[in-house]
């Protein structure tokens, strides 16, 4: 397995993408927030004491995706064209899935931006609700979809 984030001496380096072709890059990532049924219902009713949990989490996820290169040491600073955060509430599983989709016309992929956006949206849900439900957990941060660039299309097969 070849890791291109290391030079011949084993030092971490930012990969040189200057010779790569700019193409439209898209990535979608998700993170699951598991909580009590009571808290999930309160979030849906927008009756959590700290306010509109999903509205704040949406903004936090968008902001985080734009700051990825400040957080992940070897990621490239990118000019993002679009960041969206969506939430799917699953009462049967007591879960909210935060999903982040990022698009950019760039020389490198936007997977890390999508993963960062989904993760921070999930962390924000936790932060706004931790006083109500101490058992909240965040699980399964993952890439769902990516396209663009030399490696082409990737789509994760998710169980229904």
Curated annotation (Swiss-Prot):
One GO BP annotation of this record: Mo-molybdopterin cofactor biosynthetic process
Coiled coil: none
Disulfide pattern: none
CDD domains xrefs: MoaC_PE (cd01420)
Enzyme Commission number: 4.6.1.17
UniProt pathway: Cofactor biosynthesis; molybdopterin biosynthesis
Annotated positions binding substrate: 74-76, 112-113
Transmembrane segment boundaries: none
NCBIfam families in UniProt: moaC, PRK09364.1
HAMAP family tied to this protein: MoaC_B
UniProt record similarity statement: Belongs to the MoaC family.
Protein name in UniProt: Cyclic pyranopterin monophosphate synthase
Provenance organism: Trichlorobacter lovleyi (strain ATCC BAA-1151 / DSM 17278 / SZ) (Geobacter lovleyi)
Originating gene: moaC
């Amino acid at each position: 397995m070849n890791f291109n984030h290391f030079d011949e001496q084993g030092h971490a380096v930012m990969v040189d993408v200057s010779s790569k072709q700019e193409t439209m890059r898209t990535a979608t990532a998700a993170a699951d927030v598991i909580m009590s049924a009571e808290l999930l219902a309160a979030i849906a009713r927008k009756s959590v004491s700290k306010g509109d949990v999903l509205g704040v989490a949406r903004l936090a996820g968008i902001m985080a995706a734009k700051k990825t290169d400040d957080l992940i040491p070897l990621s490239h600073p990118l000019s993002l064209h679009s960041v969206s955060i969506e939430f799917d509430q699953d009462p049967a599983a007591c879960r909210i899935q935060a999903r982040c989709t990022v698009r950019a016309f760039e020389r490198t992929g936007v997977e890390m931006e999508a993963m960062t956006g989904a993760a921070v949206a999930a962390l924000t849900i936790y932060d706004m609700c931790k006083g109500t439900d101490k058992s909240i957990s965040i699980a399964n941060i993952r890439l769902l979809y990516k396209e663009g660039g030399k490696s082409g299309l990737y789509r994760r097969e998710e169980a229904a």
